[in-house]
Amino acid sequence: MKHSLIILISFLLLSSPVIGNSHKGETLYRWGECCDWAWKGFGDKEIQPKYQGEVENGKPNGLGVIIYPDGIWKGGDKYVGEWIHRWKNGQGTFTWSDGGEYVGSWKNGTRWNGTFYDKNGNIIYKYVNGR
């Protein structure tokens, strides 16, 4: 949980126009089935995952947050971190609504090098090169 706080604070500082890059964040909604998604500037946060953050060519790229609604994941599951061309890439934290979280690096949307914690902060699994 401590790791999520560090990443969240870093994200907020980097996204601040005074401290970080003054790039304006955008809101996108993910449409479609895995993994043939389309990202659109309109949608319903009750149905589609909602992304807020940096965008390039109409896709998440840079720092951003995505929150998943009920029906796809349990409502409130979210990812905070880096994106490259629509995929989670780089450092980030995925937090499940039950309090569990994965903290570490991502590669092409896959957990890569990091740690999965339960809701009490106990280590459940360590990922190395996606395994």
Where do the protein language model's features map onto the residues?
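Sec-dependent N-terminal signal peptides
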Residues: 4-14
